[in-house]
Every structure is written in structure tokens, then in C-alpha cells.
Amino acid sequence: MASTPTLNLSITTPFVRTKIPAKISLPACSWLDRSSSRHVELNHKFCRKLELKVAMCRASLDVQQVRDEVYSNAQPHELVDKKIEERVKYVKNLLSTMDDGRINWSAYDTAWISLIKDFEGRDCPQFPSTLERIAENQLPDGSWGDKDFDCSYDRIINTLACVVALTTWNVHPEINQKGIRYLKENMRKLEETPTVLMTCAFEVVFPALLKKARNLGIHDLPYDMPIVKEICKIGDEKLARIPKKMMEKETTSLMYAAEGVENLDWERLLKLRTPENGSFLSSPAATVVAFMHTKDEDCLRYIKYLLNKFNGGAPNVYPVDLWSRLWATDRLQRLGISRYFESEIKDLLSYVHSYWTDIGVYCTRDSKYADIDDTSMGFRLLRVQGYNMDANVFKYFQKDDKFVCLGGQMNGSATATYNLYRAAQYQFPGEQILEDARKFSQQFLQESIDTNNLLDKWVISPHIPEEMRFGMEMTWYSCLPRIEASYYLQHYGATEDVWLGKTFFRMEEISNENYRELAILDFSKCQAQHQTEWIHMQEWYESNNVKEFGISRKDLLFAYFLAAASIFETERAKERILWARSKIICKMVKSFLEKETGSLEHKIAFLTGSGDKGNGPVNNAMATLHQLLGEFDGYISIQLENAWAAWLTKLEQGEANDGELLATTINICGGRVNQDTLSHNEYKALSDLTNKICHNLAQIQNDKGDEIKDSKRSERDKEVEQDMQALAKLVFEESDLERSIKQTFLAVVRTYYYGAYIAAEKIDVHMFKVLFKPVG
């Protein structure tokens, strides 16, 4: 056997920004065919630009040329590491100083606070800073609202509130007239703006402000415009459907916009305010009206807190402490950079869990109210973190065969339903409520996709449709970490995302350009490492004559891709390479065992090196295995030999325990296990369940394209689903075993699930995106 080039796995390669190599050996692939020098058409619908990049790849093997191409485009890794370090430091500070959450101010809510009269009876506002804040922030066209996203609903509701405030106190007349002119000229745009962009409770608070404006004698506004009358009519009908006694008895979603509801008994409503901060559903405007009617000290304390924190202004909703912590964690995880912030994320989720209730959570702590969006996100993240989460929390949102988003409101939100769908996938055995939630959310989202109705009423993001289509195609079982990151880098809106409350607003801890920049740097650095490792994998393939076992380069690429998409960190190169090579060696050993007729003892002798190895494929297979084991010293080498010996023994008995072998070798290589761990009852349970699932998934993968009875396929799919739920329970629940050990089993099983259920043409696309396509 030819000598194999040595790859020093303890050293990570410099960061490189590569072009697609002109010559890279990826034969037997639908988009790279080694048998022909002609460019092959893609099986998947790439965009034209991507097709041209792929077409640059040719099938001839020229490892040195690839290496030259990689390093000719290299960016000094010291510079990249410095950029990563700077952004990590920034994000760590952002997360550790989150407090009640970061959100921009709202002209609408600030205007409502300005209406509070002087406590000593003078004809002036109690908080004059609010009027100055309003005057200083008028936009050039005379409106107030989000300066980067011109939406009629947002601009008009903010501007109308500010005009009412300035007119009430007869200040800044020029600014006020400019605002009135804007309203007069732009109110008609409400007819043209899609209703999905309507701010929350617009049909309730808009008529209330119009009434105030009319009472103040602002005669220049188009009160009788048809669209204005229509909106007022819709608001009246909505209020007529909700009995005021219900609002006074329990917290409903309408409490968030209570400033738009007349003739409420505010003394009775006081019992519904949040005890800790004195607000009504964390809404400054609603709390202002409550204070005006009751002079409640807790409401006043909340208002003063906001003015102090937001420099004389107020946001649309506050606090947003739970919301910020949950969504920040989600973004960092999906972007593939959460490992930099493990301690911070642990603290964030511990904080959320401390405020968890039997009905879930709202955007802020200590609320008597809950919504399905925050509850779904919190349930999923906390369950994965190891907290004991009761799935029955979702019964609070179940109404017949549907799930509602907010109390008293039917859920029509794509993003909230999508988060419910994501949470429902983390089902443990026997959790029927999550099965119901999954079916409902899956049907809702599929219908939305089919009708191209994926615009959302809580957030404006250009990438929501693509994100949800991808999420429907790739469940979390099959969505390997680096595949998820490669796509979410496309879907993450960063500062492009705009959130919808009663006005538009932005949240720095959720939508942050630094997250994206860090994710691009990290992905590119890891990808450069993976490309170098792939070069060495090809050298290893050639040197060990792997081809003679019927194993193609496409098989080699797929094996390495699965490892790199699951264990992607640069510092885990040894585990990644061991995973990929072990998978190939399993195929090599199985190949010659199918032909070898010797006894079990004879075959074991091959493994231990004590027998006559003979010539040809048998010699190559065993020599390759011995070479792999020889790269490790001492106790690790002995553990690996024992693992392979156990695998070979089971193989001879007709049990293909590849999943257990891969998980155990990875755990051994990572230094996470010893003999006591390997003999632990839970470790054995994980091994047995992993073997069962991987066996069934391998059969499903082998049956792709075959004529299999639907009943048989459905039965096997159902068994896999039940076993995956059991595995999730073993992995996520707290136990004596380290989480990292259990996570390895899950990582291996997910690659089998991916291979079984993802179409070949999709796999080709994923391999290209993860290993070869530059990001950013």
C-alpha cells in the first residue's frame, strides 16, 4: 500500500476566501461528472450566477492546483481572527447588558405621554421633554415614524398622534402644520397599502385619535374620506364583538390598545396591570390612559421609568426582556455562532426559565398574559437546553382543532405559526398536544405557501417566504447545523427586519448587522478549513486504493460532508476526519467481509494485526484501519481498537451497528468518555436506540426509488418517528451523562435521517453550499 500523506489535525488552516477551484475532484456527482470534460447541467434550479460558478469546476484531479488556488486567495488568518474577536467582544457585551431589552423609541407612545397634564393644575404638560423629543424627530416630509421604511399605516398613526399632542399644547406651530399637511396629502395612501402591513390595532386607535383631532378643532384632516370611514367602521364592529365586561375581567389582546377604547371602568381594570412594573400589557399608551383615569402610582412609576430610560421618549412596548433573550439566542444558534456565547446564552435562558408559567410567557416578565409566539420559542430553546418543559403549556392556546396566537384572537400570523411548528418538532413520546400542534401548523403553513400568502403581521422581512419554505422542506432532524447556517445567512434580515406593534420598531439584540458579519467570518473560516481537509481526504482516498472497494469519490465527498456539516468547528478537525474516514472504512470492511469466507477469529485477527493479512483488498482494508488507529496514542488507541473489535463482532453476527461505532469513536477522539462511561446504562440505551434508528434509516435510504408498498413505508416511517422522539428525550433531559456525549449520538443519527429523506439533487446543492460556495 502506498504511504499516506500525514495531515496535522492539531493545526487549523489559515482563513481563506476562495473562489470555486478551477479543478477539484468531485466526480460521480450530478453537478460534476468526472467521466466527461463537458460541463454538466445542474439537477437543481440554481440561479444563473450560481450555475456559472459551479460550471467552473472540472472533474480532473489536481490537488496541488486546488491548494494553490486556495492559498492564492488567502486573507491573513491573524486579521480574520482579530475581526472575529472584535465582533465576539461586541456581542458578548450586548448580551450581558441586555437588561430589559433594547428597542427604539415610538413617536406615537411619546405623544400619548405628552398629553398628561401638569400635576399642579397649570396649563402645560407634566413631561415637556416629550414634546421636544417629538419636535426634534419630525421627518423631512412632515411625518413621524420609521425613517427607513415608508409605510402609510406607521407614518399616519405616528403623525396623527404627534399632531394631536402639538395641537393640545399649542406648541411648535410650523412643525405641527407640516404634520397636518402630510396627513391631508397622504391619508389616501391607506387605500393602496396592503392590509398585512397594518400596524397592530390600527382600526381601534386610529379612530380614537381622529376623534381627538376633531375635538381639538383640527379641521384640515380628511375625516370623511371613504377609506377613513371604512377603517372606523371596522373598528366599531370589532369593539362591538368584545364585551367591555370581558376586558374588565381578564387580560385580552385588546388591552394592548386600550387607549382606543372608550368608557372603560379603569378602577376595575387596575387589577389587570402587571404588578411588577405597573403597565398594561407593557404598553406605554394604554398605561397613560389608565393613569389619566385613576392617577395610579404604579402606572406613573412605569411612565417615569420609560422617560428616564429613553431620554424623554417612550417605546411602543416595554420591557421586552424575555422576547429579546429568546430571539437573540435563536438568531445566534441558527447563524452557527452560538458556541462563542455559551455562558451568555446559558444566563439568558436561565433568566427566561425563572419567569416561565403554566400558560407560557409573554414578551416581558411577570405578565398575567401569554402568547404562542414567545411561548413556542421559549419552549423549544429551554427544552434543548435541558430544562424540564411540560408540553401541556400549549393547551392554553388550543381552541378546538386550531391554535390561537393571543387570548381572544385567532392566530393569523405566519411567523408565530412557524415558531409553533418548530417547537412541535421537539416532541417526546406521548405528547399528543405537540402532535396536534404540528399537524395544525404544518397545514396552516403549507396552505400559506400554496397561496403565496406568507407576509406576516408581526414582522416585515424580505426573506420570510424563503425561510419558511426551507423550514417546511427540512425538519430539524434532517437540517444539519452547517446546512441551516448556510441558508439562514441568506434569510437573516439583520437591520432590514422591521417589527410591527402599534408602530414599527427595531430591536438591536435580535436584528443586528454584527451577528451577520460574525457569522460570515466564522462560516468562511470553517469552510476554508474544510476545503483543505477535503484535499487531504482525496489524497487519502488515492493512497489507500479505496476505489477498488466500489467506493466512489462521490461516496467519499458525501461521508466528509456529513461530518463537516455536523461537526464544523475548526478546532474539532480530528473528530471530523475520524468520522469521515471511519464511515468509509466501514464500507471497505463490509465490502471484503461479503466476499471473505474465513472464520470470525480469522477476521478478528485482521483487526488486531496478529493474522496473515494476505494481499489485495483485504490487506488494503485492514491496513487502512490500522493506519487510522495508529494515529492515536495510549488509552485512546486502545479504546478505539476495542470499539472497532466490538463492531466487527456484531457485524459477523449480522448486526450493522455503524451508528454506535461512529458515535463512540467520535466521543473517544474528543476525550469525552472512559470505560465507565461506555458501560453506563444510559450510554448503552443510547447505543441500542441509535443502532435501531440508523438501521431503519439505512433501509429507507437503500429503498429510495424502489417500488415499496405505501403501507410498509408508512409503518417504517412511523417507527422511525417514534424512536426519534425517544432519542430526543434521552438526549435533552438532564442525566448523569454529559450533554456533549449524548449530543454526539444525536448528531450521527441526524446524518442518517438526512441521507434517508433528502433527495439526491438537494444533497448536491447542500454539499456545494456548505463546502464550496463562498458566503457574504
UniProtKB/Swiss-Prot annotation:
Entry GO terms, CC: chloroplast
Record-given protein name: Peregrinol diphosphate synthase CPS1, chloroplastic
Translocase recorded as keyword: no
Organism: Marrubium vulgare (White horehound)
Function text: Involved in the biosynthesis of labdane-type diterpenoid including marrubiin and other labdane-related furanoid diterpenoids with potential applications as anti-diabetics, analgesics or vasorelaxants. Terpene synthase that produces peregrinol diphosphate from geranylgeranyl diphosphate (GGPP).
Domain of life: Eukaryota
A GO biological process held by the record: gibberellin biosynthetic process
Pathways involved: Secondary metabolite biosynthesis; terpenoid biosynthesis
Key words, A-Z: Chloroplast, Lyase, Magnesium, Metal-binding, Plastid, Transit peptide
Motif DXDD motif location, chain numbering: 371-374
Subcellular location: Plastid, Chloroplast
Tissue: Present in both leaves and flowers, with higher levels in leaves.
Catalyzed reaction equations: peregrinol diphosphate = (2E,6E,10E)-geranylgeranyl diphosphate + H2O
Similarity field: Belongs to the terpene synthase family.
Catalytic class of the enzyme: lyase
Cross-referenced InterPro entries: Isoprenoid_synthase_dom_sf, Terpene_synth_N, Terpene_synth_N_sf, Terpene_synthase-like, Terpenoid_cyclase/PrenylTrfase
Cofactor: Mg(2+)
UniProt transit peptide range: 1-17
